[in-house]
Design a protein with these regions (language model features):
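A conserved ligand/cofactor-binding region detector
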Residues: 1-806
Length: 806
């Protein structure tokens, strides 16, 4: 069905009257936003019912995508775009007396994620829906998200991200489908006629109330669902305590339940934080598995065919408890024997690994499981025991290998090993990452079960990250290769036919210039910074982590600043460095790097020598809606992680799609970008992954520091500090001497000279505008391989074994 401007106007005014008791003349901008959202939600809900009925009629295998994060961004424009009603909606809003741009702009980013993991999940939901795969995403309905970042005196301050008051219009509460989760208590078991009987007593009950967010696909009536679980206590407040004036105590149990869905990634450097994180993860997977199995039984009457009709994809290790929880339901509730339950589980669950960093491969203390999840602990010990026997048999009792591969070892529960033991497939997210998993991180498991290990290189929603956010580039692509690129991203390759067309190259440059000016206006409105739009926009935006090497970028800027101070009259191409990053609240070093970047920015931006030449701006509270403004305006994409440390990256793909050129290491998906672009269309530098691995054994950054006066001068600036009087000697020590870690753990000093040289090559290339635009065009044309549609097709073909719209 098509919807006209008149249809939408009528539906919006009806929502305003029925839900807010007001006319369009009386409505606030917030009420207008929510009314628009509810109108689109109704359209999607209707399509959603039809999509689920169709899948049920066909007996289709369903995909269940579990992720602790879904970084959805704003949904009003995206849903209107996918439903093919965006122009009509904009006109309807304007004719009702509102500015459409203001209404779209006031929508908060949904606080359901943090970084690349969550954004990937959001892109994949869009592609699964567009490809008409019956799928449901599952996560937690966080009340306050991660946090809203404020920069105060150069330092990160975390504020609550209260997104729901304006963002909850997309949510459809389904209290009738509430699930009950049990924590703590004791477990008794007994055998009765050959069946294991399990009695769980004295547990604490928490309710998981589902709130569904409908997901529209592009150019299809198919709609999928993102199911978000909200934690509630089944107990009312204690009226006796309340009447005695003990108001806080009267609601204590309710508050303890509510806190489970309060924030994403609560700080876990103390016992209470660890306990809350584990509660979150079990709450999430238990509610999800109960919901999936309940729906399956309603349709098929048995769980014996569960694996034939369902596949559960777990995005990183956070949902790993889906394995013992599915076993619990199959054994305790459905009465299946262990072997049959294990066969079903290991043909239902697949695991995507997203990291090679040891600290990110989740490990939990045994005691937490024994206390919080006694029945799950029993199942885990049995899984571990049986898997250990399998390892011992295969490796002839090699206890070193057993120790590395075991699920439970030395009082610790290893979630990645659990995923490998209980999963039918394990995939990395770039060719290099998957190779490192096979050859290094999970080498022993791969030797034992080689067919389990796959690769699916990440991809991004190119409709959002080109067509929706960069309409000028979208128009160019439609003029040159046609609208087909929106559903078949490989057609973008056709743009290369225009690589030597003077008019097209000129247009590429004009598009970038206009986008830079738009972004500069937006930044000025947001934080008062005045960007030099005649300068190179050189951008590094991503989660703040030492391996991503924002500090190396800052050291290079110090080098440029020192050069300018030494010779104010030197030839210098104007250069604006843009940073955006959040540091985890408990990650002190990352917070210090943010402080350093802001100190450096303050020094440079207030030095007359740097005026109109060198500029540094830290973009506060980096988020999806900011990225949508920034990506089209960016000219240089910094992808400079230590080789072998970044699993894939998706920001690199979005920059490439928008014509930014990459300065980067051969890490993650940069490797595959290099395969399609070659040396001539990106600026590579630095050690390769195997060189990093080899050098680590003998690496001594102090020798580099002592032998190279220029390097020493740059690094010593950390001790000296800047005009604000803050010293960064702690970061200096971390690089030169080591502090609770090996010195220069991520090899910044080893790569810094090569990085500076790559930046010089980039600046020289920028001086030839026609050739730069040609390189930009080639990046755009060859980026189609990184579309999420391709990734989802790979999952469907190699892991899920489900059909999809070609």
């Amino acid at each position: 069905m098509t919807y006209t401007k008149h249809d939408l106007k009528e539906a919006i005014t009806r929502k305003l009257r029925l839900n807010y008791g007001c006319t369009e003349q009386q409505a606030s901008d917030g009420e207008m936003l929510k009314a628009c959202a509810m109108v689109l939600r109704d359209i999607m809900a209707e399509h959603g019912v039809e999509s689920r009925q169709k899948a049920a009629r066909e007996g289709a295998r369903r995909v269940h995508y579990l992720s602790l994060e879904f970084l959805m961004g704003r949904s009003l424009m995206k849903n209107a775009y996918n439903l093919n009603v965006l122009p009509q909606l904009q006109e309807a809003i304007e004719e009702l007396g509102f500015k459409a741009a203001d209404i779209f702009d006031m929508e908060p980013d949904a606080g359901l994620g943090n970084g690349g993991l969550g954004r990937l999940a959001a892109c994949y939901l869009d592609s699964m829906t567009t490809l008409e795969i019956p799928a449901t995403g599952y996560s937690i309905c966080y009340e306050l998200g991660l946090f809203k970042q404020k920069i105060v005196e150069g330092q990160q301050v975390e504020l609550p991200d209260d997104w729901k008051p304006l963002g909850d219009a997309w949510l459809l509460p389904k209290p009738q489908e509430t699930e009950e989760i049990h924590f703590g208590g004791t477990v008794r078991t007994r055998w009765d006629n050959g069946h294991l009987m399990v009695v769980h007593e004295d547990y604490t009950r928490v309710l998981a109330v589902p709130c569904d967010m409908e997901i529209a696909g592009y150019d299809t009536d198919h709609v999928n669902t993102l199911r978000l679980w909200d934690a509630k206590s089944p107990k009312p407040i204690d009226m006796k305590l309340f009447s005695q004036g003990q108001y806080l105590r009267s609601g204590e149990e309710r508050a303890m339940a509510d806190v489970i869905s309060k924030v994403l990634y609560p700080e876990d450097n103390h016992y209470e934080g660890k306990s809350l994180r584990l509660k979150q993860q079990y709450f999430f997977v238990s509610a999800t598995v109960q919901s999936i199995t309940r729906q399956h039984i309603q349709q098929y009457g048995t769980l014996k065919n569960f694996h034939k009709k369902n596949v559960i994809q777990i995005n990183d290790t956070h949902p790993a408890l889906v394995i013992p929880e599915l076993m619990r339901i199959l054994i305790d509730d459905a009465g299946l024997g262990w072997d049959e339950a294990w066969d079903i589980t290991t043909h239902s669950v697949a695991y995507t690994n997203h990291t090679v960093l040891a600290e990110a491969l989740e490990v939990w203390p045994q005691q937490l499981f024994e206390t919080l999840l006694p029945r799950v602990w029993q199942i885990l010990t049995e899984i571990s025991h049986r898997y250990q026997k399998k390892i011992e048999e295969y490796y002839h009792g090699d206890m070193e290998k057993v120790g590395r591969m075991a699920v439970i070892w030395d009082g610790a529960v290893r979630m990645a090993n659990l995923c490998i033991a209980g999963g039918m497939a394990v995939n990395g997210v770039s060719a290099l990452h998957s190779e490192i998993l096979r050859k290094d991180v999970f080498h022993d498991q791969c030797v034992m079960e080689p067919d389990k290990f796959k690769n699916v290189t990440n991809g991004v929603d190119h409709r959002r990250w080109i067509s929706q956010i960069n309409p000028r580039l979208d128009a160019l692509l439609k003029d040159t290769v046609g609208e087909g690129y929106l559903t078949h991203a490989d057609q973008m390759k056709g743009l290369e036919r225009w690589a030597d067309d003077r008019e097209v190259l000129l247009r590429i440059g004009q598009i970038k210039k206009a986008n830079k000016e738009n972004f500069a206006k937006w930044v000025f409105r947001q934080q008062g910074a005045v960007l030099n739009t005649d300068a190179i926009f050189d951008v590094q935006v991503k989660r703040l982590h030492e391996y991503k090497r924002q500090l190396m970028n800052a050291l290079h800027i110090i080098y440029l600043y020192q050069q300018l101070r030494d010779d104010p009259n030197m030839a210098f191409t104007p250069h604006t460095f843009l940073f955006g990053a959040k540091a985890a609240p408990g990650y002190a070093v990352a917070k210090r790097i943010i402080h350093l970047i802001n100190s450096l920015a303050d020094q440079i931006n207030n030095d007359p020598v740097c005026k109109d030449r060198l500029q540094v701006v830290f973009l506060e509270n980096y988020r999806v809606s900011m990225a949508e403004m920034l990506m089209p305006a960016s000219e240089v994409s910094q992808q400079i992680s230590t080789a072998g440390k970044e699993a894939s990256g998706t920001g690199n793909m979005k920059f490439m799609m928008n014509g930014a050129l990459t300065v980067g290491t051969l890490d993650g998906a940069n490797v595959e970008m290099h395969e399609v672009l070659g040396d001539e269309n990106m600026f590579l530098f630095g050690l390769h992954a195997d060189e990093v691995s080899h050098l680590q054994r003998s690496y001594d950054p102090r020798l580099l520091y002592e032998r190279d006066p220029m390097l020493r001068r740059i690094v010593d600036q950390l001790k000296t500090g800047f005009a604000d009087g803050v010293s960064y000697e702690d970061l200096w020590r971390r690089l030169v001497q080591g502090a609770d870690c090996p010195p220069d753990q991520y090899m910044l000093l080893a790569d810094l000279p090569a990085y500076a040289e790559a930046e010089q090559r980039m600046v020289r290339a920028y001086g030839d505008a026609a050739n730069w635009n040609r390189m930009s065009l080639i990046n755009i044309a060859r980026s189609g391989i990184f579309a999420a549609d391709r990734s989802i097709a790979d999952y469907a073909d190699t892991i899920w074994h489900v059909p999809y719209k070609k």
